[in-house]
């Protein structure tokens, strides 16, 4: 998840819970009255029925002290401060829900995986690690768990089909390894008011020959960025783009979070490109990673990837505020809300709650935003059938090294905080939607005009093109850390985009080579291919009906295309 720095909350551990003697239906009813009310997809009688199931299932574990961990974002703060206490009061299981930094969560997880010691009883861990969990086989398959040891503590009302993110937490073996707890997409953000201003529209049409609107491709995004940069609006000069460029770990996910796929890197396929994904990592028919560099059939340093880095650098230099180059993710995040940026191509919906606060320069007096979010534009190498952006899915993960009874108690809590009883209310607090029943709830229909397009997007057929990192990545923690260093060299000017990506793919292959040599991931671990040239692998891909690695397109400035935002939303509702 990318928002660990959005809140200034320090790491916090809250121990809640009443003794088992006090747990029960009275506590459940008090919780439903005070906290849930009508904000549930279940009617009150069914809420009480679900609470009774939790009370009964928890009896063997009453009085146990269970520790779970997640990163620090609004959704998890709500779980830690409100839902953990409610669960403890209702079930008698004492829950400590720790909130720590995203990197620290991964560190604790790795410590437990490497040592076998039970550090936490459950983790909310990014589904970006699905390929890691499947290959190391240290996380419990939830499919097997729910059918066997965990059967007696699996909520009959869990309704997995209602979760919109289970495709992302399912491995190539068809088994579910993680249960989504919160998710958010990375979309295009723009000033709806400026785009609908008659003078802006007329001036843009006169200069570029087409209508100002939501850019469908990068070519139009570039024109719009150029048009607004230096333009005076409400007495101040504005910028056509916002980004960040400091060589810092947060620069890594600016790219691993599907920037390359937005450009057209990798193959077609949803939720992720196959056989080559958006990291440029190729797998064979046995899901073994065979390479990252174009020399082995990968695409990390292919023309589409290099183009994506070049555009990132060009736009930041020409159209973003000068300070953007030296900013980190958390420093750049609040800038669009200050009112001098026209659009941002890489914007997380997790920012929504902070962007709709009353009194901000980007808010109207009636409580509606002056901005909207829309699907991301795509680069010149992108083809229909490819993913179009990133979606973060923080998911409950149970490790095999956690004793069964502790895993059972933690699994009850994981199901409680994602249950139909509480999910609508939790979604209103954190705006990180995970259930179809919550997305369609009438309370979100009412609130939608205040959320800048979030609900319209999640109700649209377009959302399937936004997905997390997929199963091609064999060891997310080891590989992800290579990205910010390599791209930092391009951002600082120490290397060209081609040199930076050549170096990145080589470093990724070194990690894969070590994994292959160690044999630690068995017959689904890396098996590096023989080296050939780009033309060889492109011809091979095309012969098999695939794309990657694509050859360089000589003219990377394609015909610009835009769409009217309101027409786009109408088309979703047809």
Model-identified regions with their sequence ranges:
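Hinge/lid segment of periplasmic solute-binding proteins
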Residues: 25-60, 127-187, 370-375, 547-572
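Extracytoplasmic "Venus flytrap"/periplasmic binding protein-like
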Residues: 85-162, 198-199, 203-205, 335, ...
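Periplasmic solute-binding protein
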Residues: 127-139, 143-147, 163-210, 222, ...
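Long, aromatic- and glycine/proline-rich binding clefts that accommodate carbohydrate-like moieties
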Residues: 51-53, 65, 368-378, 428-491, ...
């Amino acid at each position: 998840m990318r928002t660990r720095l959005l809140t200034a909350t320090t790491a916090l551990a809250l121990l809640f819970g009443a003794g088992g003697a006090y747990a029960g239906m009275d506590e459940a009813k008090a919780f439903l009255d005070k906290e849930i009310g009508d904000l549930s997809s279940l009617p009150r009688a069914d809420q009480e029925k679900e609470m009774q199931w939790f009370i009964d299932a928890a009896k063997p574990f009453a009085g146990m002290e269970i520790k779970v961990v997640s990163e620090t974002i609004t959704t998890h703060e709500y779980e830690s401060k409100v839902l953990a206490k409610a669960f403890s009061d209702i079930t008698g299981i004492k829950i400590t829900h720790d909130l720590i930094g995203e990197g620290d969560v991964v560190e604790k997880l790795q410590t437990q995986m490497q040592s076998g010691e039970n550090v936490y009883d459950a983790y909310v861990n990014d589904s970006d690690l699905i390929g890691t969990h499947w290959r190391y086989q240290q996380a419990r398959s939830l499919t097997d768990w729910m059918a066997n040891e965990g059967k007696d503590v699996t909520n009959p009302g869990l309704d997995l089909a209602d979760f919109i993110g289970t495709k992302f937490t399912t491995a190539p073996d068809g088994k579910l390894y993680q249960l989504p707890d919160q998710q958010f997409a990375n979309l295009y953000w723009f000033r709806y008011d400026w785009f609908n201003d008659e003078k802006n529209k007329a001036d843009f049409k006169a200069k570029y020959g087409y209508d100002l609107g939501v850019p469908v491709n990068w070519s139009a995004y570039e024109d719009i960025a150029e048009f607004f940069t230096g333009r005076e609006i409400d007495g101040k000069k504005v910028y056509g783009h916002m980004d960040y460029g400091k060589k810092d770990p947060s620069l890594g996910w600016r790219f691993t979070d599907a920037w390359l796929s937005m450009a057209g890197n990798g193959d077609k396929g949803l939720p992720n490109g196959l056989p080559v994904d958006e990291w440029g990592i190729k797998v064979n028919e046995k899901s073994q990673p065979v390479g990252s560099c174009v020399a082995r059939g990968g695409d990390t340093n292919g023309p589409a990837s290099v183009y994506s880095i070049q555009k990132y650098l060009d736009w930041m230099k020409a159209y973003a505020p000068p300070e953007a180059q030296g900013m980190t993710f958390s420093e750049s995040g609040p800038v669009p809300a200050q009112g001098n940026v026209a659009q941002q191509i890489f914007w997380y919906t997790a920012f929504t709650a902070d962007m709709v606060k009353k009194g901000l320069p980007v808010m109207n007096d009636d409580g509606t935003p002056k901005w909207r979010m829309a699907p991301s534009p795509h680069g010149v190498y992108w083809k229909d059938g490819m993913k179009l952006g990133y979606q973060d899915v923080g998911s409950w993960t149970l490790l095999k090294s956690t004793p069964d009874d502790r895993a059972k108690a933690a699994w009850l809590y994981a199901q409680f905080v994602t249950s139909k009883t509480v999910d609508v209310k939790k979604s209103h607090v954190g705006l990180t939607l995970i259930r179809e029943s919550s997305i369609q709830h009438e309370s979100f229909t009412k609130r939608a005009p205040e959320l800048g397009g979030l609900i319209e997007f999640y109700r649209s057929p377009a959302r399937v093109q936004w997905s997390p990192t997929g199963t091609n990545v064999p060891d997310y923690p080891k590989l992800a850390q290579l990205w910010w260093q390599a791209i930092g060299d391009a951002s600082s000017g120490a290397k060209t985009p081609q040199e930076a990506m050549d170096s990145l793919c080589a470093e990724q292959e070194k990690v894969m080579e070590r994994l292959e040599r160690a044999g630690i991931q068995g017959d689904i671990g890396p098996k590096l291919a023989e080296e050939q040239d780009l033309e060889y692998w492109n011809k091979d891909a095309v012969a098999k009906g695939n794309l990657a690695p694509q050859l360089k397109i000589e003219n990377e400035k394609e015909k610009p295309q835009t769409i009217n935002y309101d027409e786009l939303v109408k088309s979703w509702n047809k």
